[in-house]
């Protein structure tokens, strides 16, 4: 999102995606080798099917988390001066699904920023296009749960108390709009949706981060790795 100027907030991680699951492990090995060749310390913290998380410490002591994952592709990636990036529509879908799935404070901040470019209903349409298990009512509950994180969680993301208060007010508006739209245009919940109950409370601060891409992919792209910032 930072690379597309979709949001301005502190971040300490880098996400890399490929539409080919078998490419994840070779990409992890190649990246780790290249970084170590530059003097960085690299540790693989987590590894699973189609996903790895690395902690990288540069020679000057800067630390960053890097996640490499398999993810379905809705749109062709775009080329910028420094490399290929996920299409903005793809980023919008992923961030909406991240809020839908884990209700983290940063997800709410990201989706709020996206509404400057994408109407809420378009975000929902993109999310449903990528994951047929998406449900607007569940997203409404996830927004409410994310808004319940303490002010400190939003302060870490660069929001003042006043900005956090405005965001929580917007959440009430968005929740009402989502529930109204879902009532007027009801859809049958898919099995995937029923596996994701509405968040009842925000996760505790010590809860390990769930990767944004851990939602089940429903489509398969043909392009190579792209990154999301």
Regions found by a protein language model. Give the residues of each.
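Compositionally biased terminal segments of proteins
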Residues: 1-195
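Non-Sec secretion/translocation targeting segments of pathogen effectors
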Residues: 191-229
């Amino acid at each position: 999102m930072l690379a597309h100027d979709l949001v301005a907030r502190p971040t300490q991680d880098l996400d890399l995606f490929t539409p080919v699951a078998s490419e994840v492990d070779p990409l992890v090995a190649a990246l780790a080798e290249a970084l170590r060749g530059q003097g960085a310390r690299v540790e693989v913290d987590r590894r699973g099917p189609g996903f790895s998380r690395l902690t990288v410490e540069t020679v000057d002591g800067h630390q960053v988390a890097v996640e490499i994952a398999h993810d379905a592709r809705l749109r062709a990636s775009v080329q910028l001066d420094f490399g290929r990036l996920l299409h903005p529509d793809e980023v919008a879908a992923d961030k909406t699904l991240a809020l839908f799935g884990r209700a983290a404070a940063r997800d709410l901040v990201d989706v709020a920023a996206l509404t400057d470019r994408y109407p809420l209903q378009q975000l929902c349409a993109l999310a449903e296009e990528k994951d047929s298990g998406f449900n607007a009512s569940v997203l409404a509950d996830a927004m409410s749960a994310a808004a319940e994180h303490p002010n400190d969680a939003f302060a870490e993301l660069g929001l003042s108390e006043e900005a956090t208060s405005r965001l929580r007010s917007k959440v009430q508006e968005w929740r009402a709009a989502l529930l109204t739209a879902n009532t007027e245009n009801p859809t049958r919940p898919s099995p995937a949706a029923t596996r994701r109950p509405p968040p009842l409370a925000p996760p505790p601060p010590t809860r390990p981060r769930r990767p944004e891409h851990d939602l089940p992919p429903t489509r398969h792209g043909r392009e190579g790795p792209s990154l999301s910032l």
